[in-house]
Amino acid sequence: MGQKVNPVGLRLGINRTWDSRWFANKGDYGTLLHEDIKIRQMLLKQLKQAAVSKVVIERPHKKCRVTIYSARPGVVIGKKGADIDKLRKKVADMTKSEVFINIVEIRKPEIDARLVAESIAQQLERRVAFRRAMKRAVQSAMRLGAEGIRINCSGRLGGAEIARLEWYREGRVPLHTLRADVDYGTATAFTTYGTCGVKVWIFKGEILEHDPMAVDKRMTAESEGPSSGRPPRRDRDRDRDRDRDSAA
């Protein structure tokens, strides 16, 4: 039977890049990799209420830079920055190096695959009907600009005796198109009947330039707020002069 490859891993180096961005020699690589795993586990556990989408770790010389993508940056920072100082100290104890923590706000959590999957999983744990939770997530994503979305829920849905898989899809989700910006996220709901798995694919459009940092740049631009949509003055003047020359 054909299986679906992870859309994020398939597009690494094309329009996506790695969440751990550093180089190490053979002796240190394994140690640093396990450090990254422990840092992510600790942050996701500590910031369960902060709607964290992903954690990017960079390691300049004898330093560690952690970037947290969150829909609720206020929860991460805490009152007068107290919570973020505690996190910085914990990460510094784990890495034994100087730590910098940056926070990037996710303006549209409804079209972030991981956050959508976590939201559906939390609703399943609260005994919300799975069809209602899935339909609501699909409608919200399409309303906020997604070009397509697919949601899979599997397990003993609604307390059924036999586990099954239910899915909804709206729009198009091209998994084979490498230039497509397809976000993918998973979550697990721990119910009284057992665990239910949630998978979400969200298609946000095509990225035509070959830039591994394209997705990160788009997320950062969205967090900084909406732009006016007008090109810089130099470009406008150049376009106006070109139109005038062609008319002449």
Swiss-Prot record:
One of its GO terms (molecular function) is structural constituent of ribosome. InterPro entries: KH_dom, KH_dom-like_a/b, KH_dom_type_2, KH_sf_prok-type, Ribosomal_S3_C_sf, Ribosomal_uS3_bac-typ, Ribosomal_uS3_C, Ribosomal_uS3_CS. The keyword rRNA-binding applies. GO terms for biological process: translation. Residues 39-107 form the KH type-2 domain. Keywords: Ribonucleoprotein, Ribosomal protein, RNA-binding, rRNA-binding. GO terms for cellular component: cytosolic small ribosomal subunit. Residues 214-248 are annotated as: Disordered. The keyword Magnesium does not apply. Residues 232-248 have a biased composition (Basic and acidic residues). Pfam families: KH_2, Ribosomal_S3_C. HAMAP family: Ribosomal_uS3_B. Belongs to the universal ribosomal protein uS3 family. Part of the 30S ribosomal subunit. Forms a tight complex with proteins S10 and S14. PANTHER family: 30S/40S RIBOSOMAL PROTEIN S3, SMALL RIBOSOMAL SUBUNIT PROTEIN US3C. Binds the lower part of the 30S subunit head. Binds mRNA in the 70S ribosome, positioning it for translation. This is Small ribosomal subunit protein uS3.
